């Protein structure tokens, strides 16, 4: 029965991770809240979260595999051009998008760990929601980058600067990068695509490091639970990414901002108040 209980927890948390990791709603906020409600907050829980993040990352790789391989010079046919100009998304765009957060993350690693608490997550949810609204309301009327291949190196770097906000637990990496993309003149769809592609090296590096640190807590007995969480996160993230890229063509990010405000109230009510 104990195993079945853990498998149910793995299925629920894997679903939460897969659904929220790439939406601008903060996967951290959801994982803290749901993990607390399920009573799953020990060292095993931290290791479990690292494992299921790999499932979410794999989903992005599956969706964008042709473009991702193309960025490193491995081509499987022609990648469709997305944009109105003659440019192409290059590896340089990804590197420029990574540099700011990597540097700040290394310099302020200990300080970031110190603010990993519900109260700071609540504040991050609110501020991130405000940034989403700002991105929608202050963005240029006509995007300067209609498609991801129109992205300039400067825009990629500026989006990377916005990504630094995601070092604040609960802010949402996708929320920060998508909002930043809107503000620097990238269309909703292109900003979302770039956010997903940028997530692969950023999340993979951080996850592998966390996994190495979690090795003492890994046990063969936990393999079924971790496998269930991994597969669930992968499948749900795959569906969430495809669904999100479709609906974002028709709706704004305002509903996501409102949802963040509601979630902040729930976090305060359940975990703080």
UniProtKB/Swiss-Prot annotation:
Bacitracin is thought to be involved in the inhibition of peptidoglycan synthesis by sequestering undecaprenyl diphosphate, thereby reducing the pool of lipid carrier available. Keywords: Antibiotic resistance, Cell inner membrane, Cell membrane, Cell shape, Cell wall biogenesis/degradation, Hydrolase, Membrane, Peptidoglycan synthesis, Transmembrane, Transmembrane helix. Belongs to the UppP family. It is found in: Cell inner membrane. This is Undecaprenyl-diphosphatase. It catalyses: di-trans,octa-cis-undecaprenyl diphosphate + H2O = di-trans,octa-cis-undecaprenyl phosphate + phosphate + H(+). Coiled coil: none annotated.
